[in-house]
Amino acid sequence: MIQMQTNLDVADNSGARRVMCIKVLGGSKRKYASIGDIIVVSIKEAIPRGRVKKGDVMKAVVVRTAKDIRRADGSVIRFDTNAAVLIDNKKEPIGTRIFGPVPRELRAKNHMKIISLAPEVL
């Protein structure tokens, strides 16, 4: 459950380390984003010589949330941290690697490139 002002870790090698959500896309009154949703983020911390720099405004896909995700079979999945992957306007990841596990709910939201780059799909 990501809302405005939420800080997230970046789960790719785009050069950003931490980002802050500044908008949840998908409707004018939408308050919260969950896994697979697209948000607008501001880069708060970045490494030198990365593809992005501090202060850049980008779009990102939420890949991990600390809030539970309930599945159709009744199981629940949750992560320790909130994390996102930076994307471009064509919804392709900016980085070439994804760090950490991602849930298979991303497949239903058509983020296949992120699924294929991830080392583990839960």
Curated annotation (Swiss-Prot):
Cysteine disulfide partners in this protein: none
Pfam families (UniProt xref): Ribosomal_L14
Keyword RNA-binding: yes
Keyword Ribosomal protein: yes
InterPro entries assigned to the protein according to its UniProt record, in alphabetical order: Ribosomal_uL14 (IPR000218), Ribosomal_uL14_bac-type (IPR005745), Ribosomal_uL14_CS (IPR019972), Ribosomal_uL14_sf (IPR036853)
GO term, biological process aspect, one: translation
Cellular component, GO annotation: cytosolic large ribosomal subunit
Alphabetically ordered keywords of this record: Ribonucleoprotein, Ribosomal protein, RNA-binding, rRNA-binding
Gene Ontology MF terms: large ribosomal subunit rRNA binding; structural constituent of ribosome
Domain of life, source organism: Bacteria
Functional summary from the UniProt entry: Binds to 23S rRNA. Forms part of two intersubunit bridges in the 70S ribosome.
Family from the record: Belongs to the universal ribosomal protein uL14 family.
Assembly, per entry: Part of the 50S ribosomal subunit. Forms a cluster with proteins L3 and L19. In the 70S ribosome, L14 and L19 interact and together make contacts with the 16S rRNA in bridges B5 and B8.
Protein name: Large ribosomal subunit protein uL14
